[in-house]
Amino acid sequence: MSNKDNDLDDDFSLFREAVQGIKKLPQDTIVQQPNRNTKQKEIKRISREASDSEFYFSDEFVPLLSEEGPTRYARDDVSTYEVKRLRRGVYVPDVFLDMHGMTQQEAKRELGAMIAYCVKNEVHCACVQHGIGKHILKQKTPLWLAQHPDVLAFHQAPLEFGGDGALLVLLSIPEK
């Protein structure tokens, strides 16, 4: 036998002698119960997301939007300077929503979910790409955005963010 094998045997025998007579502690046999609140939290989260995505955008309400020039809107309490900054691309969107190929109902649901996501994650600027196509979403999207209480302003996006087929949206983030 080599010297290494003798050292290993000595180590094992020393360990056995050191732990001889030790009993398992009673608390080691207690199984941790799973946190039951996770199911309740999951249910609340799902219902909250469903209500966020079901934010009602009326097709009958038509806000007063400028018909001249590019599509733009600003609430009364928002400076026109902010709209100019949107137009120039000073605000860089952190979130992009591509609505190409969506129905109006899908687009409403996704738009509501995107706005809820932006408010939750404190995203101030988002880009909504509605496309041009048959002009259905291009006409409806500004009307829906103008109805949402968290939308401060929007403007037709600069070319690098989609041009005629997209809107840059400025959102109000409530202070915590």
Curated annotation (Swiss-Prot):
Enzyme class: hydrolase
Protein name: Ribosome rescue factor SmrB
One Pfam entry name: Smr
NCBIfam families to which the protein is assigned, alphabetical: PRK04946.1
Subunit structure: Associates with collided ribosomes, but not with correctly translating polysomes.
Species this protein is from: Vibrio vulnificus (strain YJ016)
The enzyme's E.C. designation: 3.1.-.-
Gene it is expressed from: smrB
Domain Smr: 97-172
